[in-house]
Amino acid sequence: MIGVDIVSIARIEKCVKRFEMRFLERFLSPSEIVLCKDKFSSIAGFFALKEACSKALQVGIGKELSFLDMHISKSPKNAPLITLSKEKMDYFNIQSLSASISHDAGFAIAVVMVSSSN
């Protein structure tokens, strides 16, 4: 399954400036906040990536999957990696997740591909 999401970087910047850490902590772990290095484009990309993952799993963000059930890190070549908690990997029968983020013209777009054992 594949999920895609696009986010306005300006919209994310406005939320960060208005709500500061409260906004970030709703959808990013402490290590993800560090990875973003206060760059609005990175924050928007991470938000889009988690939304894309929830869409690939066909559940959205809610009772079955929260923003904090997903974790974003970087590969040695700086590519985004997304993982879920072991509990959620088992719940959704996930074998692997692949991710990509891109930024252009004031937007961040992310794509997630989920391979499951179903």
Swiss-Prot record:
Mg(2+) binds at D5, E51. GO terms for molecular function: holo-[acyl-carrier-protein] synthase activity; magnesium ion binding. It is an enzyme of class 2 (transferase). GO terms for cellular component: cytoplasm. It catalyses: apo-[ACP] + CoA = holo-[ACP] + adenosine 3',5'-bisphosphate + H(+). HAMAP family: AcpS. It comes from the Bacteria. GO terms for biological process: fatty acid biosynthetic process. This is Holo-[acyl-carrier-protein] synthase. Its cofactor is Mg(2+). Its EC number is 2.7.8.7. Keywords: Cytoplasm, Fatty acid biosynthesis, Fatty acid metabolism, Lipid biosynthesis, Lipid metabolism, Magnesium, Metal-binding, Transferase. Transfers the 4'-phosphopantetheine moiety from coenzyme A to a Ser of acyl-carrier-protein. It is found in: Cytoplasm. The keyword Repeat does not apply. Belongs to the P-Pant transferase superfamily. AcpS family. InterPro entries: 4-PPantetheinyl_Trfase_dom, 4-PPantetheinyl_Trfase_dom_sf, ACPS, Ppantetheine-prot_Trfase_dom.
